[in-house]
Regions:
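Short beta-strand micro-motifs enriched in acidic
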Residues: 27-29, 51-53, 83
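Generic N-terminal initiation segments characterized by hydrophobic and/or small/turn-forming residues
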Residues: 6, 43, 76-80
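Hydrophobic beta-strand residues in large extracellular and virion-surface proteins
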Residues: 24, 36-38, 50
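Short, structured protein-protein interaction patches enriched in aromatics and acidic/basic residues
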Residues: 30-44
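Ampiphathic alpha-helical segments that act as solvent-exposed interaction surfaces
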Residues: 64-88
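Intrinsically disordered, low-complexity regulatory segments enriched in Ser/Thr/Pro
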Residues: 43-69
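Negatively charged, low-complexity tracts enriched in Asp/Glu with abundant Ser/Thr
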Residues: 1-34, 65-66
Length: 88
């Protein structure tokens, strides 16, 4: 069975939205590759784009593996930590 990366990215964006300091700037599901763009609301420079690989890993634009689709909440929390965000 193929991984539905669009659904995984939608779930990732939802968990990002639970962090008060983070904002989902774009959810580009029709792009190749599809991605979520996230930024810290209080910084013009703290931002990151995240893709979902076919093997089920969330990966930043610079190649850092945030976690797997088996635990989307933890992957989103790891990005929140990297972007210096506080939990809601």
């Amino acid at each position: 069975m193929m991984l539905d990366t669009a659904l995984c990215l939608e779930r990732f964006a939802w968990f990002i939205g639970r962090h008060a300091d983070l904002s989902v700037e774009a959810l580009a599901l029709a792009s190749d590759p599809a991605y979520v763009s996230v930024r810290n609301r209080f910084s013009a420079t703290l931002m990151e784009s995240v893709t979902c690989s076919e093997n089920g890993s969330f990966v930043t634009s610079w190649g850092y593996r945030l976690g797997s689709t088996d635990d989307v909440e933890s992957a989103a929390a790891r990005l929140a930590f990297l972007l210096a965000a506080m939990p809601a």
